[in-house]
Amino acid sequence: MPSAPTWPALITTLIEGRHLSVSESTWAMRQVMRGEATPAQLGGLLVALRASGETVDEIVGFRDAVLEDALPLDADPRALDIVGTGGDPYGAVLNISSAASIVAASTGVPVIKHGNRGASSASGASDVLTALGIDLTIAPERVAAVLRETGITYAHAALFHPGFRHAAATRRELGISTLFNVLGPLCNPARPEASAVGVADLSRVPLMVGVFRTRGATALVYRGDDGIDKLTTTGHSHIWEVSRGAVTEHDLDPLELGIPRAPIEALLGEGVEENAEVIRRVLAGEPGPQRDVVLLNAAAGLEAFDLMGDPTRVQQPMARRLREKVTVAAEAVDSGRAAAKLEEWAAATRA
């Protein structure tokens, strides 16, 4: 009978170049979520994993423990999450996923966004949504009600995963991308069946794809060639399409969609309030590179949702599918529905 895991044994396993099993990973994350791991133990785990490179089994084990500990979110899982890992080399990319989520919801697709405050970036989803008037302090049951009333809601990680607070200081002090950047997009407590997920670190794409594939989930996983966890407009992006256990890879040039190239500087923000103001302007219909990148990423979410209902869509060229979805997203913005959706959502969280 194998002996019970210990922190020295697990960290030694990693620094010797070996990997943790699913059960060992689950044990370690349970310790973290319960506050039973010391900052030194957690820091050692995060750094050792970062150095050795996480495996799908390790991420599955960590994810299982996080969801086991999560507060329930009673919502129809036939919904969409648009999210990114963060951890890009710039540290100041606009909150594109948050804006894209609002646009997607304004087209009629139910959106359950999951996120947290910034740890490895200047402005996390929770930060910018607060600045946009979304009340993150509502009770978990109210979060589900807001989805039913408005078609969009936000699962604030600090609310639904209270155990994450035990890792916050260590993550902040390390200041690097860690396994938590990978876990975030995988731990939505509502378990939505469609996901559009940006991954900044190319080495971690197989992890994200592998977990979605193992779950039998539907997802578009993507990364800009400029290193951002978004479909970019500065150049090409790579997309990994996961459907029914199969993975199809695509290369995307925004020019194929009629979207002009933009300098990376146009996609960077200066802070929470500034990012919120950019989102307001985009939702109000202001043209420019910020609008273009939001529409592109909203299109990815819309395509992931449609793929969930019709897996045969994988047979069509990705550029054609996304071009159609960009048109849908643009119409939602230009009609005023996207801006109205933000106001409706904010009001519902304050009701």
Curated annotation (Swiss-Prot):
5-phospho-alpha-D-ribose 1-diphosphate binds at residues 84, 87-88, 95-98, 113-121, 125. Its cofactor is Mg(2+). Keywords: Amino-acid biosynthesis, Aromatic amino acid biosynthesis, Glycosyltransferase, Magnesium, Metal-binding, Transferase, Tryptophan biosynthesis. Anthranilate 2 binds at residue 171. It is an enzyme of class 2 (transferase). One of its GO terms (cellular component) is cytosol. Its EC number is 2.4.2.18. Binds 2 magnesium ions per monomer. Pathway: Amino-acid biosynthesis; L-tryptophan biosynthesis; L-tryptophan from chorismate: step 2/5. Anthranilate 1 binds at residues 84, 116. It catalyses: N-(5-phospho-beta-D-ribosyl)anthranilate + diphosphate = 5-phospho-alpha-D-ribose 1-diphosphate + anthranilate. One of its GO terms (biological process) is L-tryptophan biosynthetic process. Homodimer. Catalyzes the transfer of the phosphoribosyl group of 5-phosphorylribose-1-pyrophosphate (PRPP) to anthranilate to yield N-(5'-phosphoribosyl)-anthranilate (PRA). This is Anthranilate phosphoribosyltransferase. The lineage of its organism: Bacteria, Bacillati, Actinomycetota, Actinomycetes, Micrococcales.
